[in-house]
Amino acid sequence: VSVVGTVR
């Protein structure tokens, strides 16, 4: 989970 909020 990145800072942008993606599942990645």
From Swiss-Prot:
Domain of life: Eukaryota
Tissue: Nacreous layer of shell.
Lineage start: Eukaryota, Metazoa, Spiralia, Lophotrochozoa, Mollusca
Protein name: Uncharacterized protein IMPP2
